[in-house]
Design a protein with these regions (language model features):
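Cytochrome P450
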Residues: 1-392
Length: 392
């Protein structure tokens, strides 16, 4: 019989260090469990999250109290129905399969080759700083249609926005950094928006400014910020997670090197294994029951994608990285109307361009024997360092 939510005490620091033990405890307690440090009812079960994502009338994206709104403005991620449908449609031309293949994949190849050119003469590096962060940043600058923006700047903006969106502890310094990043992005948009209005092109900003229904500058700004948040960290962290998964499973790496079509499997498994976007929030619009838990109108629920993608009721041996795992739907790109618009672009960038080039250009790639990688986060999760060596 459904009951009121259980609760547990866990700190944000503990979640950031390793959320998976907590996710397992929550799953044992109920479908939605109150975690006071997050100010959310956390949902960790695969089927419970799918149920919520299929019912946006009850589990609404529209959420006036969302941290995302406070940090980035009222974006399409916090809208439902026709309003969401229109704003999503305004960015989709930049992500069409034909546009990705014709315009973006060749540019991704050029950027990757240039970064690897700079590494080939070396014998060790931290792939986060020297490759994954600049790769994701430079590709996103191209996709957005920004000009004169350094990759280090957009990487900082993205991290500041993500930190702000996950600032459930109310840290004032984090909030100030997010505000500064938001203001800098507004300036970057202002510098190019008239150019894109006059010259239609494949970029996201051009797509927005030539949409059938005119968008306000406020709408454009908010949606660009959402794209900078998720559109940078997802490819960056999925690059690093896939490389980490393969380097810690040498037999799987051998299989991939022998059959490059398996790079796509490795990418999908990495997104499941460590979901870069690990949690997002929904507002309960009316009294309801989710699984075994009674929820009240205006409750805030955190859909823990990182937990759902390791739900043992869905995936066998879920904590293992296994590229030979039977193909099953995961939630690494979300679900329902808010399924990630950039999914194909990310699959092409990472699975078809980045991974083959890394392992081809950096022979005998392996983890650094003296500097283990570090993984952090729960709202957004991935390696924050990935020291590697190659050659001899």
């Amino acid at each position: 019989m459904p009951s009121a939510p259980a609760s547990i005490e866990i700190t944000i620091a503990e979640l950031n260090a390793n959320p998976y033990p907590t996710f397992e405890r929550i799953r044992e307690l109920g479908s939605a469990v109150w975690v006071s440090s997050t100010r959310l009812h956390l949902v960790t079960g695969f089927e419970d999250i799918v149920c919520a994502e299929r019912n946006h009338e009850v589990f609404a994206s529209t959420n006036p109290n969302s941290l995302l709104n406070k940090v980035m403005g009222h974006s399409l991620l916090r809208k439902d129905g026709e309003e969401h449908k229109f704003e999503r449609a305004s960015i989709e031309p930049a992500f069409r399969a034909s546009v990705v293949s014709k315009y973006w994949v060749p540019r991704f190849q050029e950027i990757s080759a240039s970064l690897l050119d700079a590494l080939e003469s070396e014998n060790e590096t931290d792939l986060f700083q020297s490759y994954a962060a600049p790769m994701a940043s430079l590709c996103l600058i191209e996709l957005l249609g920004f000009k004169g923006v350094a990759w280090q700047d957009i990487a900082w903006w993205s991290q500041a926005l993500m930190d702000g969106a996950g600032n459930y502890q109310g840290d004032e310094a984090i909030a100030c950094r997010a505000t500064a990043a938001s203001e800098a992005i507004d300036m970057a948009i202002d510098a190019v928006i008239e150019m894109h209005r006059k010259d239609e092109n494949p970029s996201i900003l051009s797509s927005m400014t030539h949409a059938k229904q005119t968008q306000s500058l406020e709408q454009i700004r908010a949606n660009i910020k959402v794209i900078i948040g998720g559109g940078l960290n997802e490819p960056r962290d999925s690059i690093l997670t896939t490389v980490l998964g393969l380097l810690t499973n040498p037999h799987q790496l051998d299989a991939v090197l022998a059959d490059q079509e398996l790079y796509a499997n490795a990418f999908e498994e990495a997104i499941r294994w460590v979901s870069p976007i690990g949690m997002y929030v929904r507002r309960v619009a009316e009294d309801t029951v989710l699984g075994d838990t009674i929820l009240n109108a205006e409750d805030q629920v955190g859909l823990c994608i990182g937990a759902a993608n390791r739900d043992p009721a869905r995936f066998e041996n879920p904590h293992a990285f296994d590229i030979h795992r039977p193909r099953m739907r995961h939630l690494g790109f979300g679900a329902g109307p808010h399924f990630c618009a950039g999914t194909l672009t990310s699959r092409k960038m990472v699975g078809e361009v980045v991974l083959p080039m890394i392992f081809d250009r950096l022979p005998k790639l392996r983890l650094h024997p003296d500097h283990p990688p570090i993984e952090r986060g729960w709202v957004f999760r991935g390696p924050t360092t990935l020291p590697v060596v190659w050659k001899n």
